[in-house]
Amino acid sequence: MKNEEKDKRYVYIRVRDICIIGVIIIVLSLLWNFRDKVETLLLNNHNEAKYIAISSLPFNSNGKINYLDKDGKTVKVVNKDLYRGYRYIEHNGDMYISNKDNNILKIGKDGSLKDFEIIKKDIFKKDNRGIYVDRMCIDNDKMYMTHSLVGKTDIYVKDMTGQEEGKKLTEIPYDIRNMCIIKDEIILTADRFEDLVNIKSDIIILDKNTGKIKKVSKHDEYIETYNMRKDNENNIYVETLKRRLTDEELDKPKKENNELYDRYISKLNIYNNTIEDIVVDGKKLMGNLLRVEDKNMYAYDDKEDKFKVIDLKENKEVFSEKIDGYIRSTYFKDDKLYMNIGTKDKTYMYIYDVKTNKIIEKKEFKVDENRDNTIFPIT
């Protein structure tokens, strides 16, 4: 009789433990699935959202999108698969982010979020290499994307209106690093390695509709891979890196300035195969090309640690100010340039007013300081 009672008690305990474990799993699952709402509820901040911070960690996809009030305090949290190396472009006030395989995240200027596939899943499964977007460009409601492979690049096109399915436009035998669109042509830059130190660039022109190569031109300059901008008149501006140290100088003990390249901002003429220096106040323009809007070019001079505004019509500098940090991103809205500036442990927003040629506001945001943050305003 005692053995039967022991057996019953043992079964009862096992069933109870299984039920408890099951309840814990269900609760944890619910908390995970609704973690956005739980985090937002715990914030207890009901202010209106004025900014969005895209936050990512260096080594995994545990990303977040934080909605911030006017003082930079978080009012809402959305967890997303965002890697540190994500790509983004801004178009008509909306942000488009390549945040995972075969996926683009659209962050609307009103703060709305929308995921969409590059191509249909059934087509996507046929290509087991996956699609990881390197560069994006939007023209007439169509997004063009590059996916670099070893020694070649696939180019995809996606109709943003949803009237047509996404498709692979072409595959070309070049390692594409950047692109922009001029009228009916896709302008691409590709690296050409002569050796480990000497890198030069090819310019490839494709037909935007067919993907066929129309022209390839080779340049002695190395066109920096990440920054390529065009103005309203379809002039193309790039960064060019020119060697400043010889092979013999590289073998010598380190000097105070041992950078291999000097960085210049240049104008690219794709039709006569020339790269022209931009001369401002008698000096060749150096530094990082941030963006071009209307007649103004926005640049960061890393030698002087200064943000600069260049009037391209007058070829003169109209603004210059020291920036204590790294300019992570820029966003243009209502004649104002919003600059997201990061330091080792802080994140700032500088707002430059085009009409007055002044930085009219500087904000500090205390949000996920151990992450990489990209912040921009919402309407």
Model region roles, listed by residue range:
Residues 17, 145-146, 266:
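N-terminal non-globular leader segments, chiefly Sec-dependent signal peptides
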